[in-house]
């Protein structure tokens, strides 16, 4: 069986127009996959040069396959049907190591056709590294590397206003474009680069903040033989991802035409502010996960997919989304309903086995950031606590007992919470503390909740009643009235 290369598998090639910091699975099944579709169906005509931003030889370079690789996109489509689509990605031209070939890295700035910079250098990538110097070849941090590359471009084109770049980071931090720009400006200042360059940075370049959403499951180790039998070639860079994707870019409206999204819209939104979309994702997708986990797990279920195939648990989650979360969010209802429908479809994806215990990590913080705002907004709007979001809090407290059907399971959270719960549940088991006292002790940790939740009218009473029901009747019977 042949290995992928451009000689044996000839096809379209595109001129270098995009620099991409990061060679990982996510960008390849998200940004590069979208660029490849735009290249095929529009006149975008943009090839990608991947920059490996760290000093490592693992994984091997994409150059071993001439930049070619396959994405396998699978899940439930908009009609609820299971689909699996293989696509040979031809838009990556080559990979460069910023460490092994620094001169080639700098020469990317000399190409007049270069226009876009994408990146995913992990959440820690957009950060300041105190030791970075202009003369380093290269500097350590991604923002410092980008500053050096931008200065190279500024010098090469004598500060031409039309040679700036559109910079679109995909790192999972809030307002990533603004954070990246601030660090680039900091390095430019600390390195005492000319004021004219600093002016050019802000006037000729556009830094866009983004929200990215797609579960990328990466190299399908257990299925490689079967998948390569289908494609007919060996591919060391096979990349799998879910069917759903969403790319929200905070930037000028003109960006839609420049990326040819006017000719092939994809699920990309060019917006003035990503904040409402971030809130929607956190509240609906992440919030539903956080509400689901302690309820489903204590009902004897182990994965998200199994939970969504359980009629009662599925009903609980969907009612929480549609009746308690969506009504308090600040976006058009039809948009929210459409997004929620996609979310529940994603949860049902038969190709992804999402373990509930893996999502349970840091559940206390997740509840505070993902569910509590909607719980309090619902109470304010309707004068009553939303029953399912409140029940989810009781289920979360019960989850921290660390035991299901007589079997212990790992609970992963901040050490303070682990210690606190061990003490509280031990005292409760020994009859030294009532359920109400336990609930009050949890809700009154103001440092965590950023307020004393035990003072929220009715919350202690309702959570106590729910927790008593869980402890007395078991999760199945306790949750039934809310399904």
Swiss-Prot record:
Major enzyme class: oxidoreductase
Pathway, per record:
Carbohydrate metabolism; pentose and glucuronate interconversion
Per the record, a Pfam family? Mannitol_dh_C
Per the record, the GO terms for biological process are: D-galacturonate catabolic process; mannitol catabolic process
At the top level of its lineage, which domain of life is listed? Bacteria
- What are the binding positions for NAD(+) in this chain? 18-29
Tell me which UniProt keywords the record has, alphabetically. NAD, Oxidoreductase
Q: Which reaction does it catalyse?
A: D-altronate + NAD(+) = keto-D-tagaturonate + NADH + H(+)
Entry's Gene Ontology molecular function annotations: mannitol-1-phosphate 5-dehydrogenase activity; tagaturonate reductase activity
GO cellular component, alphabetical, reads:
cytosol
**EC nos:** 1.1.1.58
The family database entries (InterPro entries) matched by this protein are listed as: 6-PGluconate_DH-like_C_sf, 6PGD_dom2, Altronate_OxRdtase, Mannitol_DH_C, Mannitol_DH_N, NAD(P)-bd_dom_sf
Q: What family does the Swiss-Prot or TrEMBL record give for this protein?
A: Belongs to the mannitol dehydrogenase family. UxaB subfamily.
- Put simply, this protein is called Altronate oxidoreductase
Q: Which organism is it from?
A: Klebsiella pneumoniae subsp. pneumoniae (strain ATCC 700721 / MGH 78578)
